[in-house]
Each structure stands twice: as structure tokens, then as C-alpha cells.
């Protein structure tokens, strides 16, 4: 396609459409034109035209974007050209320092990319792209604007060096990053600190925007230096509180100088909030410095300086009124405890005063509950870890936590109770609605609350009694929900959550009988509240209290009910006196009564039903508890009366959202586990249990073919599919599963088949049915190993085949779908079908050979449906949607293992699609997918190798098999690049990547090498010749060692030998490629 834009005016119109245009069509066209411009031979000249003569900043931004994409290509531009681009941009920004900030940023990113990708490039024995540091120093000697540009260059370069590009070998990135760390990063940090000292030494005019910008950029540069991934650990940022900064040993001198920390504390106190929070961010990293950087005296001194800084900030807290400063300071405090032990903290001279200040700061923060809950997380983390460390402190110095921890607990409790009235009266967002944050904070509080537990318990008892009495007064007489009742219910909800929290905080190795007795005192009150609330149903009810009660019951279950329960626990002493609950059997009765009550009265409140059923499910896991549960009357009632009449959530009325039906699977899983305890081979008992479902199915059968009540039928079928999936999941024995199969076949399975055919375009209906079929196909615990006289395995597969074929054929009639519709409407169903098919193929309960033998086409049909669905999915979607990739690739592994005749008889375009999907899957980060790809490739390569090895030796009776193998061989000969590309990918993975499944990679690689020895020799030569002369012989020896003792066959013994050699090879090559970045270059651009 020829370029349509030649003049500057046309290019600027393109920029307008691309960056500020509102017409979507024009923007898409502009994006296409941009890609065309990048591929054009005139790209550089057009970029130069835009930069030098463009009239808008967007023209300059387009030029920078094009240059960035151009220099980032896998096939790099010549060294001279990249040097010219770098020098041109440096001169350009030097001559125009007042460019728009986003243009300067984009141009500097181009310089950073060029520098990183060319870090090891050599001309005339010099690393030509490392001169950037010297170039930047020229900027620093100019005006303030030039100085800012110089700092941004260093900052962007540091960030770029730290940025992992997943499209390139990770080993190459680590090599560049490590070299930059060792040769330049320390100098950059020293330079940045010296600039800050210079700025701080002069009177700072904060009204001067340029000076403010300079300080901001220098602080960002320091932060980028300290955030550098020094050892390639790629720490998960979500685990922020666990971070340790692995500062290199060569930086010790910088960190040992007290002036370094003083500088950043002084900057915090001197700068406005936008800048001071950057200074605090730097201090967070300083506080996170690895312990091993210092010896013991040095560490104590360094900690002392940090504590002094904390004290100074808390004594002058004005800056903490800014949310950014407040958040960073909370992180700073949490990092102190992460990296220093309580025994070290108490030895600091200022510790008593500082812990008092921190306690007061925490109490104030908790009292302002509406302010920055994300920051409070770090404060609670600090106190949680401090209190958790108390049993292990050996120091004689007082830690004072027994004084301050109860105050923190009290502040949390009282502040949450006080918040309720404000939330209700001012109609604010209720913190209790954000359950993720509430649970996280409660989990932290449970440790703190156990310090001086007597005080916590006394406070909670007093508050609970007071609020429960007030609530009872408001209920009698009951005159409807009032503001006062709502407030009281909110306070009780918090108290129940808090009681559950402290009970759940019991630790076996630190608990005492007195503490258990206190847990009993608190638990009594919640059990009494349960009775009070349940007697008022359905007239008065409160969802928040119910959710809190379920939280408490679950915490009590984890702590005091279970297989390892201490029967002598004092928790039951007080409960026995007040409630008559003497042991865990009585508690289980209370649990089950509560569950039945909730399921009966809370049918319209999905959160309560869902949490109740999850609690029931948790109770039903564990044989000892199950034996106790089945003796309880409430359980017997559930097993005989699981209908919508008793449990409204099982109804199909329009009041229930279809998404609410999901909880029915959980209900029937738990219920079936309870049934299984005493079921044995009692078919009558099973039939009685299934009676409500039988009635429902018979109703559906009667009205399915009529045109009325179709919506009701659909909802009934969705509910039934979810119910049966829960039942099937829990039936893990052959006897019980056979009962279910006999109940479903042949009457009800065809009904589900018809539903899929009728409502194939409605995933709310098809997804539950397909998931049920996928569950039925699972041979878990060998439950599908039917008796030898039983045809059930084949009958089940035939039904699955019909359903998959029906769905697969119908879903393709939907045509093209939008990006947001393609997964829910199509790909999700396909992934479930593939999962079901994989379970059938790998289940070992069907002899697939009999289908062809007896002229049954169900097996062939389902394989053809697999192909049709596959060809309707793009390769990118296969890998983009995780559930789809994790069902397709294991299925393909089964097919290549046991059904190679199907694979080799595929039409060439289909076979090419399958092999391409394997090739692309080899490089994915998902080890499940990449391992399946390796295994599938190994089966294909092994088949091909054996065919070639036996060519010409086959007797006449095997001619058909030979012809099938010949077809595959012919395809590979027509497309030699397919296997060559995969060999290249696997070699690249072994040599350059962090290979997490080395054994899997090694298996197909041997076959590929034996089939393509010539191409392997080319790859070997490519790698060896790309290295400096001193390394070439070392690498050549590595390759010789790789094939040493390896024979020309694929026997298990030979494969194992190759796998062992490959492990040594990988280690030796990594050692050979590892070089001192100061001395010699090493190109790692071998294979793409």
C-alpha cells in the first residue's frame, strides 16, 4: 500500500486524528497510517520533517512514537544509524529545552531504548552507547531547563534498564541490567544525591516552577535508583509490605554516611507536599535496605538514624495532613518492622518515646476511620508484627507493647462503633460493605488484640452487653425499622465481627485456660444474639448482622471445632452454664440450626445465602465431622426436604437472578457429602434423596415441547443442571456414581441435550449444562470404572459426544462476535467442551476402538466438532483466554498421545493450525500450557522419527500405517520451517530464558535434533559465531558435550541421557555467556 501522506500538512492532519480526534473511524485509519509510516523507507526523513518543521506538539509526539517503535524492533537498525538517531535527539532537546513535557519525555524514551538495546555494542573497542552518562553531564552544566532534561534522561534510562520486555529473552535483559547496575547505577545515585545537596544548600525558591520541577525530577531519579531490581527477583508489588531492597555491597559507604538519611529527612521537612512525599518514598526504600549490607554495630547505628527521623516527623506532624505524605509515612513505619527485629528496635535509645508517638499517631489515624483505609493497613501491619514478635524477644529492654497494644485495640474497636451513627445519619458509604478491607484489617487486629487479652475481653464484654440491651429495648415494642435501630444493628454487626476476630486469633502455643474461658464469655453473647435475631425472623432482620454472625461461626469452627479439638477446652465452661452447650456436638447442632434458619428465611439475600452455604460446605469437609453432622436432626431434615417450599433460594421465580443459582451447586455438594456417609448401596435411599429433582425433571418433560412457560422451563433446567453438578462432584465412588447415572440415563440426559440445541445462544443456560456434562465425564477416584458387563462408559461418551457436537455446530452459526462478547458467548462454552472431551479421552473408561469397529460415528463426530470449533478461534484468543488455553492444550496432548491417526489425517491447513498453536504455546509463561505443548510436540516428533526409522522395513500388512506416516512426512517436507522454528524456540528457551520446565523442553528437543541435524548445526554455528573469539571454543565444547553419548534413537535410556546432558549444557552455556560487562561485549541475539 503506497503512502498517502507526503507533505507536512498531511502528516499533521494524521497527528490531529490520532491524538485529539473524536471520530473513531478516522483514528483507526490514522493508526493504520502510523504502522505504514514505521514500515516505510522514508520513516526517518518524515520523523525529521515533523520534528524540525511541525507546528504542533502532537507532530513531534508522532515522530517520537515512530522512532521508539523503529528502534525497538527485534531486527535492529545498523549501529551507525542508531547512533545518529541518538545524537540527533540529544542535540534536538538541547536546542529546544522548552518543548512540551510529554514530547521531551517521549524523545528521551527513544534515547533510553537505544542505549539499553545497544548496551553491549562495540565500535573500535568502545561501548559506543555507554557514552550517554558523559553526554548527560553536559546538560547538567547548562541552564535549569537543560539540567532538568539531563536528570530526566538518567531517570528514564534507569527505568528502562529495569523494565522487563517479555518479547525478548529474559537472560539478555538481566545481563544488560546487571552490567548497568555494576558500571553506572552507583554513579547515577551519587550524582543525584550531590544535586539534591546543591539544591538544598542554596535558598530554595519554591515559587520558581523550574526549581520545583528540578527537585521533583532528581527525587524521581533517586527513587528509580533505589527501586532498581538489583538481583532479578522481580518482587511482586502487591506484596509491598514484604519488600527488601537488595542494595549492592559497593554502595555501603553511601548508606553508612549519616548525611545521606539526614538529607532526605531535611528535604521532607522543607519541601511542599507534592515533593516531600517523593522524599518519603525514597526513605521507605532506605528503610527497606537488606540487613546483610551492614554488620551489627553499623546496622544498629543506621536503625538509630531512621528512628531519629521518625521521631522528628511525629514531633512535627504538620506534613502528615497531606494524604500522599501520610500514606508514604505509614509504609515507612511498616518497613521498619519488616527489616528489623523487635529486639533491635527496643535497643535504640529513642525507642520508648518513639513507640509512644507511633501509638498516638495510630490511635489518631484509627479515630479518623473515613481517612485513607489503605494507609491504615500499614499501621496495623506494624503493630501486628510487633506483637507477634513478643514471645521471641530476648532483650531485657522493655518493649512497652503490653502498654500500647491494648490502646490500639481499644481505638480500633471504639472508632468502628462510633462510625456507625455518622454513616447512617449522613448516608455515607458503610465500611462494612467493603468486606475485603474489613477482613484484612480484622486479620491484622486479631494478633494485636491478643496482647493483654484480659483488657480486650473486658472491653468487648462491656460494649456487647450495653449494645445488646439497647437493641432489645428498641425492639420491644417493635414499630418498624428506625434510624436508632439501624445504628444499633450496625454497632452489633461490628461487635460480632470483632468477637469472631479475637476468638480466631487464638494460638495453640500461647493460649491458656483463662484465655479460652474468656473466649467462652464472648462466644456466649454471640450465640445469645443469634437466638434473639432468629426469633424475630422474618419480621426484623439485618443482613450485616447475619454476615457478621457467619464470620464469627466460621472463626469459632476453625478454632474450637474439628478433628483435633481439645475436649478439655475451658471455652465450654461458661457456655455450658448459660446456653447448655457442653461440647462440639452441641455447637454443631447450633451451627446446623442456624444454617437451616438462614436457608429458610434469607432466600432473597444472595450474600447471606452464599456465605451460609460456604459455611455448610466447609463443615462438610472431613469425615469425623460428617459422622457427627448426620446424627443432627437439622441435617436429617435437610436431606429429606431440600425443596423450594422449605428453602426458597431453590425456587425459580423472577425474584432470583440467574447468577444467584450458582450457590445451588455448593448446597448440593455439601448435602451429597452428608448423604454419602451412610448411603452405602442403598438405592432406595438415593431415590428418596433425588425425589425433588425427579419431580422437577418430570415437570420440565411435560411442558418442554409446549410454547408456554418457556422461561420457567429454562430457569428450572439451569437450576437442575447446577444441582446435579454439585451432586456429581460429591459422588466419588463407583457405586454412588452408578446410581446417579442410572437415574439420569436414558430419561433426563436427552432433555439437557435438547436444551442446548434450543438455547445455544444463551450462555446463562448452556454453561451450567455443559459444566454438568464436563463433571460427569471426570473419572475422579476411578468412579467411572463400570463393571465389565456394563456399557455405561460408552453410553455416557455417546451422550457427551451428541452434546458437544450439537453445541459446536450451533455456536458457529452465531457468526462474528464483538471483542467483549466473544468469550461469554462462544469461547467459554468451547473451553468447557474441550475440558469434557479431555476428561473422556484421558479417563480410561472408554475403548475408543470399538466405535469404528461397530460403525458408530460418535467418536469421529466429536473429533470433527473439535476441529470446527478450533478453526473458529484465532491463535491469539487461544493464548489470551487462560481457561480456553488450559483446556485446549491438555486435550491436544491427549490426542497426540493416543490418537495420532486422527492428527496425521487432518487436512494440511488444519494440521498447520494445530502445529502453529503448539509453536506459539511453547513460549507462553503459563507452564501448564508450555509443558502440554512440549509433550504434544514430543509425541508428534516421536511418531515421525519412528516412521522414518522403519521406512522400507515394513511388511505388506502394515502398508496402511506406512501410508499414514508418509502423509505426515510429506507435510513436514513441504513445510520444513515448522519444526525448525520450534527447535529454534526450544533452544532459545534453554540457552537464554528462565526455563521452569526444563525436563518437558528436553523431551521433544532430542527428536527435533535427530530429525533436523543440518538445521541444528546452523543454529549451533549461529550462537558460537555471535560470541567473541575467546568464548567460541568454550561454546563449541558445550555443544559437543550436549550430544556426547547420545545415540540416533528415541529410547527411554537415550532420552534420559540427553536430558542429563542438556541440564549440564544449560549451566555451562550460562557460565560461558556470563562476562564482566566492563571488559568484553556479548551479543545474545541468536534466535527469535
Curated annotation (Swiss-Prot):
The modification Phosphoserine is found at residue 569. Pfam families: IBN_N (PF03810). Its main location: cytoplasm. One of its GO terms (cellular component) is cytoplasm. Transmembrane segments: none annotated. It comes from the Eukaryota. Keywords: Acetylation, Cytoplasm, mRNA transport, Nuclear pore complex, Nucleus, Phosphoprotein, Protein transport, Translocation, Transport. GO terms for molecular function: GTP binding; nuclear export signal receptor activity; small GTPase binding. Highly expressed in testis, moderately in pancreas and weakly in other tissues studied. It is found in: Cytoplasm; Nucleus; Nucleus, Nuclear pore complex. GO terms for biological process: mRNA transport; protein export from nucleus; protein import into nucleus. The modification N-acetylalanine is found at residue 2. May function as a nuclear transport receptor. Binds to nucleoporins and the GTP-bound form of Ran. Belongs to the exportin family. This is Ran-binding protein 17. The lineage of its organism: Eukaryota, Metazoa, Chordata, Craniata, Vertebrata.
